[in-house]
Amino acid sequence: MFSSILRKVFGSRNDRLLKKLRKNVDAINALEAEFEKLSDEALKAKTDEFKARIEKGEALDNILVEAFATVREASKRVYGMRHFDVQMLGGQVLHEGKISEMRTGEGKTLTATLPTYLNALSGKGVHVVTVNDYLARRDAEWSNQLFTFLGMRVGCNIPGMSPEQKRDAYQADVTYGTNNEFGFDYLRDNMAFSPQDRVQRPLNYAVVDEVDSILIDEARTPLIISGQAEDSSELYRRINTIIPKLVQQEKEDEEGQEGDGDYTIDLKAKQIHLTERGQLHVEEILHEESLLPEGESLFAAGNISLLHHINAALRAHKLFSKDVDYIVKEDQIVIVDEHTGRTMEGRRWSEGLHQAVEAKEGVRIQNENQTLASITFQNYFRLYNKLAGMTGTADTEAFEFNHIYGLETVVIPTNRPMQRKDMPDLIYLTAEEKYEAIVEDIKACVKRGQPTLVGTVSIENSELISRILKKSKIPHKVLNAKFHEHEADIVAQAGKPGAVTIATNMAGRGTDIVLGGNWQAELEKIENPTESQIEKVKAAWKESHDAVLAAGGLHIIGTERHESRRIDNQLRGRSGRQGDPGSSRFYLSLDDALMRIFASEKMGNMMKRLGMERGEAIEHPWVTRAIENAQRKVEGRNFDIRKQLLEYDDVANDQRKVIYEQRNELLDEGDISETIAVIREDVVSSVVDEYIPPQSLEEMWDVSGLEERMRADFAVDLPIKTWLENDDKLYEEKLRERILNEVVDAYKQKEAVVGEQVLRQFEKAVMLQNLDSHWKEHLAAMDHLRQGIHLRGYAQKNPKQEYKRESFALFSEMLEALKVEVITILARVKVQAEEDVQKVEEQRRQADDVPKNFEHEDATAAPEEASDQVRTQVREGAKVGRNDPCPCGSGKKYKQCHGKLK
């Protein structure tokens, strides 16, 4: 209450920021008349003028007012579109490296041209990041006209381009592309075979469109480049036949009472576990199939791979559903993004899950993958000097943006007041009743000529509603990942009178639904249209537009609540753009996923006791509030998962930075002999210390062992015993120095034979080849460490601290092993001529040329530390769970009834 009084007196931080930015908007508006008088040439010349001023040391902030005025005037001449004052506010927020929340239809694409132009003047490049290839291409083509007019070049970075095309796109002043492609290019550059293979410039400034989708929804899933490992497709097929023989058990085994099922499912955590009975049953089947030797346990150390296959197959069959989590397309499993409903072509699940799904669906099984490089979006986007974002729904996640990315969210007011009417949710007992009510609502909209957008959470649901509408003979269009090629056409006409469009939650996002339909799309169908044809199309559109306005604008129907309030708000936000009228309503049932998890059995019993008849619904603000509270819980849990993923990845990120920095230095250096000399001294000293411990008695020295080791590792025959017999003053330091000198002399002799240039090339090739192979193995070791680290919680240890400690130890061991291997190879290998160097280079290139997968994998952070162990209690009869119905028959939960007495 006190804070709300303070806000009324002093205004919120958001209000104060906007008030400050409005001063610049007034200054830009004051320049408008002056800039209107400039010729096209004079306006274009402004770009060179600004660049010259920046080169002399002038700050971008000092040029902002004139640069924004230049872009506004250029836009008027190129597109006939003038930036509104609210777009000027949004542009300034983006330039300051903040998130600009602008409602759907407020012109985010046009707003982005302002800070993009200003920051591109520095010559360091600007990246505009979009959610898919279609939007990247569309926005690049659209903005190209404006930037070309202003003397700048636009590039587009999409999958499938050659390195030359990518390099050209990155050299442009402004580069449009998808988040995945920018991230993969960064990883590829750090795996480059030579400096010429790199495509990116240093990361300068990024404007992220639909920033919530990219930095939050997709932040739980790291980008991974992987190569294929050994073929185990036959084993996947055989394990696949075992799963249908297993039976699900509803509850986990309890003390003294074992269930009769083989596995249990945890829907919230999306996990599946074998019961004790299930383990024995699986072992029995594996013995019969000759996959497990008689008398051996599934959990024996040698059978870890078999257990891994069983778990993957169980998850594939019981947790992943066709047309919800994936689709089958051209003999391949294509993942469906749970957040956007789009297909993720070329992406694969890790840990053998993808192969298990392939076996389940009977398509060709592709080999398992080995991680070659990986990064999370959190750590990739934090590499930019300045990061900004825009979306229609960021305010609900403002804390996360600030906490993880250091980005402040500024809510920009709408150009015209919002007129959309958001109606309370309707809740039905069953899904069948819910769909009947939805169809009735659609029929009413069609009858009055009101366009309808029906939002679903999965492809399966969108196709179910489509089938129901077909039965009712209602014409409609379906927009989901299966038909994303026609996305723009469907969205363009979704605002026509009486049009019905079914879309998975975020399909079509980024394209406005214009009331009355899109007249420009109609015009494109006519070849070389005449003036009269253009006028005819515009007149027809005006008639449709007015009819839709009279019918109430676009009506949004939500068929289910999403886990996140933000995604529900995005669906609502498709209606009511630019002050247009509109309406929205969500239809729910107790069968919905969110309601199954969070709505208690009590609510269902209460609805039945109220004597609700078929087709009746509950409509009350309390219910809507309860659902939003449930969504808040899920959002909080998802935030914790993302935060935890980041905390674990930060450990790997520090190591990644060190390796990538070293690797890039090696690539750019022509001569690394000084580095090799330093490493050689370290390695020789370590070897000597093993056999002659520092500050030890001569009796403790293993001289013959040291002689043998020097012969084996460094290919030098050193009579160390003779040296010691002949020289009484030859102690540790002097001996170490003499051994090192002998190793260096032997290497110099090799250099004299082979030639300095050849040896320098050989050193670089060996160093890079070994760095890459050791880093690859280290990533696999880190993966394995990560998968089991949560078990340390049972030993009362903090898994995060343990992970940090052990990963540091692994990293140190990897660096030591790398040093030893490089020096011993250089010492032992006989380099005859340049052909030998080329052989090593060829090996490196072959290792680099293996087929790679570019994956945006599902990842879950390692579970938090386990709770403290508690004393075991002996109980008579089965345990009653706190959330189970009370055995007394009251219908209440146990914790609310007799459980209160405990």
Curated annotation (Swiss-Prot):
Its Enzyme Commission number(s) read 7.4.2.8
Per the record, which residues fall in region Disordered? 565-584, 840-902
> Pfam families attached here?
P-loop_SecA, SEC-C, SecA_DEAD, SecA_PP_bind, SecA_SW
- Bias (Basic residues) occurs at 892-902
Which cofactors, if any, are listed as required?
Zn(2+)
Tell me the keywords, alphabetical order.
ATP-binding, Cell inner membrane, Cell membrane, Cytoplasm, Membrane, Metal-binding, Nucleotide-binding, Protein transport, Translocase, Translocation, Transport, Zinc
Compositional bias segments (type: Basic and acidic residues):
840-859, 873-882
GO BP terms: intracellular protein transmembrane transport; protein import; protein targeting; protein transport by the Sec complex
Q: What does this protein do?
A: Part of the Sec protein translocase complex. Interacts with the SecYEG preprotein conducting channel. Has a central role in coupling the hydrolysis of ATP to the transfer of proteins into and across the cell membrane, serving both as a receptor for the preprotein-SecB complex and as an ATP-driven molecular motor driving the stepwise translocation of polypeptide chains across the membrane.
| Subunit text | Monomer and homodimer. Part of the essential Sec protein translocation apparatus which comprises SecA, SecYEG and auxiliary proteins SecDF-YajC and YidC.
Write the protein's name.
Protein translocase subunit SecA
Task: Tell me what gene encodes this.
Answer: secA
